[in-house]
Amino acid sequence: MKRPVDFFAMKENGEKITMITAYDYPSAKNVEQAEADMILVGDSLGMVVLGYDSTVPVTIDDMIHHTKAVKRGATDTFIVTDMPFMTYHGSVNETIQNARKIIQESGAHAVKLEGAGEVVNKIARLTEAGAPVVAHLGLTPQSVGLTGSYKVRAKSAQEAQELMDNALAVEAAGAIAIVLEAIPRQLAEKVSKALSIPTIGIGAGLETDGQVLVYHDIIGYGISRRAKFVKAYADIDETIEPALASYVKEVKAETFPEVKHSFTMAEEDLKGLYGRE
């Protein structure tokens, strides 16, 4: 299993880092078999697998539950787990206790926090406490309630400078990597070159040190609309939906199960059932 020191070396050597967001045992197993470098258990599970309208309702217990499943499916892959909405905006002690709970109970190797500002100090204190932290800048989904959209961030010179300053701040605080989401590729390149820690892009162009996409987006599973930055490598919904429809049709028509899908018993045993001939 790769560790933070390995990710630093990959950046140094120009080897791209691959991260895939997964939420359960079978998807994590697939990701590990594909030899991805990292798995992110994102609070996006709230929308992707729990059916919420946003990530806001996701709880620490949700994150622990799904991370434990991912851990069972990917026993030899570095796992990063999101700290959900408002679990790191209270006191430093509350933040440390929430991170401790996630790491100890789920087996995650690191936690991810969105934003900068007061979050920078939380990253520093978690790092001091021995908890590896991945930062997340640009489009931060937990803040969509304030920003009102999932549009690209940091397009103006002022916003770009602010993001650069924040990236340097979270690096100085001890973050082991930074996710850069939905920012101009030119800015992502400058940030990546300015930092000594890896940048993982999603909608941030080719020049970041690595890339992350959601498992479901990659394979086309349960997706009604794809973001511009998502490339579909498969569309398994096109296989799943007719398969399920065929099952329903065959059960209604009494053509499933066939004999080959059933078990039998010896006729003499059947005749002797409850002493009846």
UniProtKB/Swiss-Prot annotation:
The keyword Flavoprotein does not apply. Mg(2+) binds at residues 43, 82, 114. It catalyses: 3-methyl-2-oxobutanoate + (6R)-5,10-methylene-5,6,7,8-tetrahydrofolate + H2O = 2-dehydropantoate + (6S)-5,6,7,8-tetrahydrofolate. Keywords: Cytoplasm, Magnesium, Metal-binding, Pantothenate biosynthesis, Transferase. One of its GO terms (cellular component) is cytoplasm. Pathway: Cofactor biosynthesis; (R)-pantothenate biosynthesis; (R)-pantoate from 3-methyl-2-oxobutanoate: step 1/2. Its EC number is 2.1.2.11. GO terms for molecular function: 3-methyl-2-oxobutanoate hydroxymethyltransferase activity; magnesium ion binding. Binds 1 Mg(2+) ion per subunit. Its cofactor is Mg(2+). The keyword Transport does not apply. It is an enzyme of class 2 (transferase). It is found in: Cytoplasm. Gene3D superfamilies: Phosphoenolpyruvate-binding domains. One of its GO terms (biological process) is pantothenate biosynthetic process. The active site is at 181 (proton acceptor). 3-methyl-2-oxobutanoate binds at residues 43-44, 82, 112. NCBIfam families: panB, PRK00311.1. Belongs to the PanB family. Catalyzes the reversible reaction in which hydroxymethyl group from 5,10-methylenetetrahydrofolate is transferred onto alpha-ketoisovalerate to form ketopantoate. This is 3-methyl-2-oxobutanoate hydroxymethyltransferase.
